[in-house]
Amino acid sequence: MAHPLIPAILDLARPIADDLDLEVVQAVFHTNQSPPILRLDIRSRVGDTGLEDCERMSRSFELALDEANIIPDAYVLEISSPGLSDTLESDRDFLSFKGFPVQVTSRSPNDDTVEQQGTLLGRDADSVYLNKRGRTVRIARSQVLEVKLIEQL
């Protein structure tokens, strides 16, 4: 369950990211840490996301966040970009990571959890497609629980 401050944080972060040609992928507020950690994952709209993008977003967002006083106590702000071990969700994710090794977790017809690894071939309205040892494997999207990047097969 998302922290109750996340909607206000996203409302503040998205226009700043837009001005920098960036997109906010997600925000997570880890309040079980001392001090709490606010992590924003960003992605460049015009190419690869680099350290410079994270630095620009960090500087701009930190000022706005402090002015808005959404988080009254001390916190740590982390700006990062999606990478390995991240879950693929959007159409852009599936296009960007086509050809990369992934692990697909799905639900079988008898309600078991099944994990398959392969090279991502793509996704359409009905299925996710993997290459497993030279064979194309089709997994119905209705059965897919999660698609994650992995380091290698």
Swiss-Prot record:
The keyword Cytoplasm applies. Keywords: Cytoplasm, Ribosome biogenesis. The keyword Hydrolase does not apply. InterPro entries: Ribosome_maturation_RimP, RimP_C_sf, RimP_N, RimP_N_sf. Pfam families: RimP_N. It is found in: Cytoplasm. One of its GO terms (biological process) is translation. GO terms for cellular component: cytosol. PANTHER family: RIBOSOME MATURATION FACTOR RIMP (PTHR33867:SF1). Required for maturation of 30S ribosomal subunits. Belongs to the RimP family. This is Ribosome maturation factor RimP. It comes from Synechococcus elongatus (strain ATCC 33912 / PCC 7942 / FACHB-805). The lineage of its organism: Bacteria, Bacillati, Cyanobacteriota, Cyanophyceae, Synechococcales.
